[in-house]
Curated annotation (Swiss-Prot):
<keyword id="KW-0978">Insecticide resistance</keyword>
<dbReference type="GO" id="GO:0045747">
    <property type="term" value="P:positive regulation of Notch signaling pathway"/>
</dbReference>
<keyword id="KW-0472">Membrane</keyword>
<feature type="topological domain" description="Cytoplasmic">
    <location>
        <begin position="1"/>
        <end position="16"/>
    </location>
</feature>
<feature type="topological domain" description="Lumenal">
    <location>
        <begin position="38"/>
        <end position="322"/>
    </location>
</feature>
<keyword id="KW-0812">Transmembrane</keyword>
<protein>
    <recommendedName>
        <fullName>Beta-1,3-galactosyltransferase bre-5</fullName>
        <ecNumber>2.4.1.-</ecNumber>
    </recommendedName>
</protein>
<dbReference type="GO" id="GO:0008194">
    <property type="term" value="F:UDP-glycosyltransferase activity"/>
</dbReference>
<keyword id="KW-1133">Transmembrane helix</keyword>
<keyword id="KW-0808">Transferase</keyword>
<dbReference type="GO" id="GO:0042661">
    <property type="term" value="P:regulation of mesodermal cell fate specification"/>
</dbReference>
<dbReference type="Pfam" id="PF01762">
    <property type="entry name" value="Galactosyl_T"/>
</dbReference>
<feature type="glycosylation site" description="N-linked (GlcNAc...) asparagine">
    <location>
        <position position="150"/>
    </location>
</feature>
<dbReference type="GO" id="GO:0008375">
    <property type="term" value="F:acetylglucosaminyltransferase activity"/>
</dbReference>
<comment type="similarity">
    <text>Belongs to the glycosyltransferase 31 family.</text>
</comment>
<keyword id="KW-0325">Glycoprotein</keyword>
<dbReference type="GO" id="GO:0006493">
    <property type="term" value="P:protein O-linked glycosylation"/>
</dbReference>
Amino acid sequence: MFLCVRILKRKYHELSSFQKLLIFTITIFLLWVLGVVDKFRETSFGDFSWPLETRNLQLRSKFTKYPQCKFSGNGQKIIIIIIKSSAKNGPMRESVRKTWGVFRMIDGVEVMPIFIVGRVENMEIMRRIDVESEKYKDILAISDIDSYRNNTLKLFGAIDYAANPNQCSSPDFTFLVDDDYLVHIPNLVKFAKTKQKEELVYEGFVFDTSPFRLKIHKHSISLNEYPFSRYPPYVSAGAVFLTSETIARFRNSIRKLKMFPFDDVFTGILAKTVNVAATHNENFIFWCRRVSQKEWDDGVIAVHGYARKDLEYEYSQLNGFE
């Protein structure tokens, strides 16, 4: 090993000044791309604080479509399920509607699934959304462009609607979920019945991670956007259970805080700001994998990663949904 180092040193000294400068420049560039430079410049999470941002955020004026209220008023408790869906994912929404999205009342609890979508430039897709909304009356549409980094704007819309549904009773609980999840509604209801709407509940699959500084990573974030060494604990945005008290706290603060492009991390920031703890629940399964019948029977609530056909097949195989 020592001999190898000596040989490398000798070789390096034999290089021209230009070659040495080139190696130095490439090394610094690679360290920058890999995010190593940013890692050394991060602020300790112990000094975390999130800035306020003055803006006139009138969320309700950004809604372009509202779902029809389908609560009968006869339930002991109410759960609104707001399903995040890309505007182009019409077939997936159809699969949800005919599988776990069919439930309206179970064990005295009313359930109302709706879909929140953004806007796309493709007018044919927007026309289909119009038809779908007219047919099912379960679309909550916002005027912002439907994109990954605009998911925080969908979060704003979902929280605003859940806090004050249009011409509808306010729910006791809100379940935010992506359209590629399989949700076991009886287990969700059973879980909800252990909670009170006055509790502060922000629950799901919790992550406690550091920011990605690798420049080419999908979740890369700059120091200007987020200077701290860690994120606050946050629930994966794919499946989040909230009480009405938590929704109220979130809504009161969400308009005042500086935006962040990743909705799950932003919710963690929001929760930390208003002193709501993120609670980990193993029955919200984030990693894509096969779930056994025993796991469903034992209380699994939501599982991530289903394509349309897989969702329909898995649902048809499950017991306990009837």
